[in-house]
Amino acid sequence: MARPRKSEHASANAKLIDAFWACLEDHRLTDITISAITKSAELNRGTFYYHFRDIDDLTARAIEVEFNSQALLPGIFDLIAGAPGSITAIELVQQRMQRLSLLIDRGGLDVLSMQIKRLVRQTWTAILCAEGESLKPETLFIIEYTTSGIIGLIASETMRASSQTSPDALNGFLAHNSAFLLEQIGNAQGVPRNIILERIHATRRVSRLNAKR
């Protein structure tokens, strides 16, 4: 069987991802099947397995595509790092997380949380470490703890029919949390706070440029 052309490969991949989100409109994540995906995408099972190992692989890829298309990683990372002028948690949910909010509502919080933590760890590694180096265990503990809290806030806002949270109160909490985070990470990793902030600003610029491409 001939390999699909690049344009056909991209088209089938996108159709399967769109079909995943369409199925999620009516079903919980654990109830979605490959048959339902291929039927919605009007593709066969062979095409599915050419692109993805299983539903978990498709879910992870769908989340990654959504992160890139909605510039979600810069937004979430800005929240965690307390970057000046960053979007609020409420704005992030309301403006950029419609599909991921649906995933949370359909029982996918654990899957989404795992993907967010992986991407955030990668970003902090790029900021704090030279090539070939790794984050120290103490730094990883701090990042894991803080990221879990931010994800909890996002999930809480997602599950509210209409948010009653005061943006000022939430912003104040996040600012306090960010100051603590930068101090603790700097101490654990041995990087001065001003250097961390400089690298965060540089990373934000690169992330936003990539998101616009």
For each predicted feature, which ranges?
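Short Lys/Arg-rich basic patches
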Residues: 1-6
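An amphipathic alpha-helix adjacent to DNA-recognition modules
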Residues: 10-21, 25, 30-34, 39-42, ...
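Short, hydrophobic secondary-structure boundary micro-motifs
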Residues: 32-33, 101-103, 112
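Terminal, non-globular segments
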Residues: 51, 120, 124, 180, ...
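Secondary-structure edge/capping motif, primarily at the C-terminal ends of alpha-helices
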Residues: 74, 100-103, 127-131, 157-161
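Amphipathic alpha-helical segments that line or abut small-molecule/effector binding pockets
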Residues: 79-101, 144, 152, 171
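Amphipathic alpha-helical packing segments from all-alpha helical-bundle domains
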Residues: 87-88, 108-133, 137-154, 168, ...
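C-terminal peripheral helix-coil segments that are non-catalytic and often amphipathic
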Residues: 156-213
